[in-house]
Amino acid sequence: MAETLKIVIPMAGWGTRMRPHTYSKPKPLVSVAGKSTLEHLLDMFASVPSPQNTEYVFIVGPYLGEGQIPAFVTEKYPNMKAHFVVQREMKGQSHALYLAREYLHGPMVMCFSDTLMDADFSLLADERADCVAWVMPVPDPRRFGVAEVGADGWVTRFIEKPQTLENNLVVVGCYYFKRAESLLAAIDEQMARGVTLKNEFFLTDAISIMIEQGARTRTEAIRTWLDTGTIDATLDTNRTLLEKAGTHTSTQVDRYTGTQV
């Protein structure tokens, strides 16, 4: 991957489902298994094809995130190429990306800040699809969004909160776009059409517009998906990560400098 990869992490929400923990800090800085959720999330990207040719875009909220997230990232990751964008109005996921458009060029990964998974991002080095959505089969998908895949293996559409159990490929909240510009064009179209749900612009609607326009979109299955969006889910994730940490140790590498630590 010759072009700079942009990793975009929207995190502007109020964190109401994590109160009282989010009264004094934004949700990504809440501790899970000895580290903040944000640190676990950034660890997840260690397998990107060219770590030293990667830039991060953090979309933060105006309350606590605007001050605390940049300070935390600058202190913890001094070698990271990072940009920070403030989303002052909660108008949805697509709106957040629209605000960050000046930084979004070429290949891009977007992952929500409460999504932890076991993805291998090294596959992006040779990826030919226009869009990849990471998915995980679950017994009951009705609380989530799912990807509908055609006989040819390409995604035909996304469905939010399906009414049946027939399609259980749940979209976990992480996507790759071969060209960020294509997504931004779809977001422009989404906003022009006024495609919203509860007055918010959802990313899956923008991707559906990309598919309408011919974008080849596929899924990539994962085996582990950990959520930190609610207190109960965070407690489960904390237990899972602690159990995993107790089974093995590994050498860590600073992916921004290549130095073992």
Language-model features: locations:
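Short glycine-enriched loop/turn motifs at secondary-structure junctions
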Residues: 22-24, 166-171, 219-221
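A general structural signal for well-ordered alpha-helical segments in protein cores
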Residues: 38, 66, 70, 97, ...
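Short, surface-exposed amphipathic charged segments that create phosphate/polyanion-binding patches used
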Residues: 97-104, 146-149, 232-238
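A structural signal for short hydrophobic beta-strand segments in well-ordered beta-sheet cores
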Residues: 29, 147-149, 219
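Conserved N-terminal catalytic core of the sugar/cofactor nucleotidyltransferase
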Residues: 1-12, 17, 23, 30-31, ...
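Conserved core of the sugar-phosphate nucleotidyltransferase
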Residues: 116-194
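Active-site glycine-centered loops adjacent to acidic/histidine catalytic or metal-binding residues
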Residues: 13, 114, 137, 230
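Left-handed beta-helix
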Residues: 1-4, 151-154, 181-182, 188-261
